[in-house]
């Protein structure tokens, strides 16, 4: 408001003074007083506004004419109009971003209102972070009137972002600067030429259209200059931008801008699918790129790199970055850098959790897995076994394990996940199921690291941690008895074993316990013991000179109550001569049952049955083999209970009295031959003598010197029935020999 507090700006208008309002009628007796340019009183006369008559006193102060105190309304006439007013004094707006010099008459000295709409903002990239406005402005002032140079800085740190905006007064100046500076000059301290282009939205604002083309299948070694030369033949190229990754390497695609649609169409017709760059094997892909507005505040040089193919100004959207140019269909889509393809039929073994490769595979529903008796280190990665073809009388799982151990594949027991194999899908479990069978071991000489070929509910208390605890047996002579001779104790007797398997500190006890669980395997082998006794005299002389360490005695001491010693607890050397008589014992223990069918596992993890005499293979279990297994099971059921009870009760005393057990072995003439009979040497035959070889010190590879020939031995094993055997009744009669030894050791 102008004037004192008791006054207002409006005054009665005089008839002779021009002002802001045109007279509205012919009665000049009252009205508004015109305002002068400075906001004061316009003149002495008045002009009345003709309108409705008001009967209340006027609220306006009197003018120079003392008798005028109120408005007098007249009848409104139809010639009402507004005369242009004198321009008021313009004041700078409070919300104005940048001030411009203002003259005394309220006009801009630089660019007036009409000129401001034609100002053009350019984006400049590849600006050194140390550059200042004074260093940048001279390069652009050479090509037009530069109104402003604005360096882009980080809001938090205040550091420059390596780009800036330059505002020109006219679009002609901006176009001239783009043609002269884009990819042409390098600012002091810069690493490459600057990129000069219209800022986002500037072309739309000033009404200048651009025609942008997406170009694919470019040579990744090509530069912007080389790409521009290809497109220059169709018209003036305003901009060339190559998409680059976070290492500033070209991705083989980019964008080319034309100023007219005709030149852009000509480039598409002349290059798309017809022109091939040097060093490329595919023609160029040229098409229109649909523009996409970027997020506010982001530009091509400011967007952070996102994965491969994310050059400046490209943001991650979904599986790949999307450029602000809008066309990303030509971009190479990203994939996970490492996602191993899973095979449908060959999956990780269900009983192993191999983490040596840094991954933890687990069987999934609908994904076939190798059965538990093929849980070698190669099973989880789809690698076929070295000998996928079935060999007569040789378990394929044993062959796998022999080859894996010979190749130096070492699986640490502590890395096995302690999960019960009971959780396997039923169709994927081993398919040898007997009535009342409770053993996961059915091949006493050729079992793998996991051992079971028959898994029933009573076995759920045996975790995978026990699987790699029988390493030496991997190198044993494989026989055609793939099942029916080994049984684990009943479920009630496996409860104590379960509790001792989890603590890693009790691995030694785990090894011994699993040994005891295998004792029933060789109790039915009466011919094996008798053969040992016959060969004692012939082998005793050379064996007397062979050293046996105390740990080796501990392994033999375990023989006093079982048939399989725990070599994992031996760190000494065991001569190979101890292993010479296993083949005759094995053949004779098997020959009493006339079964020529053996169970094997294919490389895909499926069970099949092979006839060693006829060479026939079947997927279904033969009736002959079922009868064979039942007969063996009946024999084992009579032998199982007393043997396991004795083995569990004497476990601790056996480990504490190696010297006493050694003497007892000498008294029973079972010292060296009995120990060796169950560890046949690869390639061993009935009457072959071998020089002594030390057993490996690593408990996981107790017979590494022998295991190297496991593959060759598997092809030369002794078939079923190679050694004759007599009636089964002698087996029952000779059972008391090892049992008496166990009771003596306990005492």
Swiss-Prot record:
Compositional bias (Polar residues): 320-353, 395-406, 461-498, 674-707, 726-739
Family annotation (Gene3D superfamilies): 2.20.70.10, 3.30.70.330
Residue stretches of biased makeup (Low complexity): 448-460, 642-673
Further comment: While FCA requires both FY and FLD, FPA requires FLD but not FY to repress FLC.
Tissues of expression: Constitutively expressed, but the negative feedback maintains the active isoform a low level throughout much of the plant, except in meristematic cells at a specific time in development.
Subunit annotation: Interacts (via C-terminus) with SWI3B and (via WW domain) with FY (via PPLPP motifs).
Matches recorded under InterPro entries: Nucleotide-bd_a/b_plait_sf, RBD_domain_sf, RRM1_FCA, RRM_dom, WW_dom, WW_dom_sf
GO terms assigned for molecular function: RNA binding
Biological source species: Arabidopsis thaliana
One Pfam family named in its UniProt record: WW
Domain WW: 591-624
Compositionally skewed regions (Basic and acidic residues) per UniProt: 291-301, 630-641
This protein's record includes keyword Amino-acid biosynthesis: no
Protein name according to UniProt: Flowering time control protein FCA
């Amino acid at each position: 408001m102008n004037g004192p507090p008791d006054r207002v700006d409006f005054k009665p208008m005089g008839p002779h003074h021009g002002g802001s309002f045109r007279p509205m009628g012919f009665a000049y007796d009252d009205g508004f007083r015109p305002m002068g340019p400075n906001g004061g009183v316009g003149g002495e006369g008045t002009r009345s506004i003709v309108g409705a008559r008001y009967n209340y006193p006027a609220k306006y102060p009197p003018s120079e004419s003392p008798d005028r105190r109120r408005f007098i309304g007249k009848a409104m006439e139809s010639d009402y109009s507004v005369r242009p007013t004198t321009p008021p004094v313009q004041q700078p707006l409070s919300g104005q971003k940048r001030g411009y010099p203002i003259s005394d008459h309220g006009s801009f000295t630089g660019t007036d209102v009409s000129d401001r709409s034609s100002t053009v903002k350019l984006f400049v990239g590849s600006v050194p972070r140390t550059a200042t406005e004074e260093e940048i402005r001279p390069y652009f002032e050479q090509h037009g009137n530069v109104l402003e140079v604005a360096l882009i800085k980080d809001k938090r740190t205040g550091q420059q972002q390596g780009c800036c905006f330059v505002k020109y007064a006219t679009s002609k100046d901006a176009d001239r600067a783009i043609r002269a500076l884009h990819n042409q000059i390098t600012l002091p301290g810069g690493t490459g030429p600057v990129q000069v282009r219209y800022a986002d939205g500037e072309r739309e604002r000033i009404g200048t259209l651009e025609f942008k083309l997406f170009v694919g299948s470019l040579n990744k070694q090509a530069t912007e200059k080389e790409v521009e030369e290809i497109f220059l033949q169709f018209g003036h190229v305003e901009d060339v931008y190559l998409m680059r990754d976070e290492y500033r390497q070209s991705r083989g695609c980019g964008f080319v801008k034309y100023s007219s649609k005709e030149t852009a169409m000509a480039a598409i017709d002349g290059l798309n699918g017809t022109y091939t760059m040097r060093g490329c094997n595919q023609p160029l892909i040229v098409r229109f790129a649909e523009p996409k507005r970027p997020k506010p505040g982001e530009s091509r040089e400011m967007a952070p790199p996102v994965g491969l193919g994310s050059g400046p100004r490209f943001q991650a959207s979904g599986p790949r970055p999307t450029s602000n140019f809008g066309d990303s269909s030509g971009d190479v889509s990203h994939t996970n850098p490492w996602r191993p393809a899973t095979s449908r039929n060959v999956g990780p073994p269900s009983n192993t959790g191999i983490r040596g490769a840094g991954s933890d595979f687990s069987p999934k529903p609908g994904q076939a897995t190798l059965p538990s008796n093929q849980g070698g280190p190669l099973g989880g990665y789809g690698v076929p076994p070295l000998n996928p073809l079935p060999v007569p009388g040789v378990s394929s799982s044993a062959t796998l394990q022999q080859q894996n151990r010979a190749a130096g594949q070492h699986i640490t027991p502590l890395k096995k996940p302690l999960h019960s194999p009971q959780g396997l899908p039923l169709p994927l479990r081993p398919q040898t199921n007997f009535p009342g069978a409770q053993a996961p071991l059915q091949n006493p000489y050729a079992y793998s690291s996991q051992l079971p070929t028959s898994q029933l509910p009573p076995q759920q208390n045996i975790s995978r941690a026990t699987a790699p605890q029988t390493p030496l047996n991997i190198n044993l002579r494989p026989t055609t008895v793939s099942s029916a001779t080994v049984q684990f104790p009943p479920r009630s007797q496996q409860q104590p074993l379960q509790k001792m398997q989890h603590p890693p500190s009790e691995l030694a006890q785990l090894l011994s316990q699993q040994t005891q669980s295998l004792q029933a395997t060789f109790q039915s082998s009466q011919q094996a013991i008798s053969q040992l006794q016959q060969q004692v005299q012939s082998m005793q002389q050379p064996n007397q000179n062979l050293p046996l360490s105390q740990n080796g005695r501990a392994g033999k001491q375990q023989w006093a109550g079982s048939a399989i010693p725990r070599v994992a607890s031996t760190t000494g050397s065991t001569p190979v001569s101890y292993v010479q008589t296993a083949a005759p014992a094995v053949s004779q223990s098997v020959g009493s049952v006339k079964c020529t069918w053996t169970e094997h596992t294919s490389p895909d993890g499926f069970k099949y049955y092979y006839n060693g005499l006829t060479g026939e293979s079947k997927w279904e279990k033969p009736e002959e083999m079922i009868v064979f297994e039942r007969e063996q099971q009946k024999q084992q059921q009579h032998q199982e209970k007393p043997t396991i009870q004795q083995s569990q009760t004497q476990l601790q005393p056996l480990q504490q009295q190696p010297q006493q057990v050694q003497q007892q072995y000498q008294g029973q003439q079972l010292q060296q031959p009995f120990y060796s009979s169950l560890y046949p040497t690869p390639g061993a035959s009935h009457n072959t003598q071998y020089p002594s070889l030390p057993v490996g010190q690593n408990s996981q590879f107790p017979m590494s010197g022998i295991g190297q020939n496991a593959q060759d031995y598997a092809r030369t094993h002794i078939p079923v029935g190679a050694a004759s055997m007599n009636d089964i009744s002698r087996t029952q009669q000779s059972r008391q020999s090892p049992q008496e030894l166990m009771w003596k050791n306990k005492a």
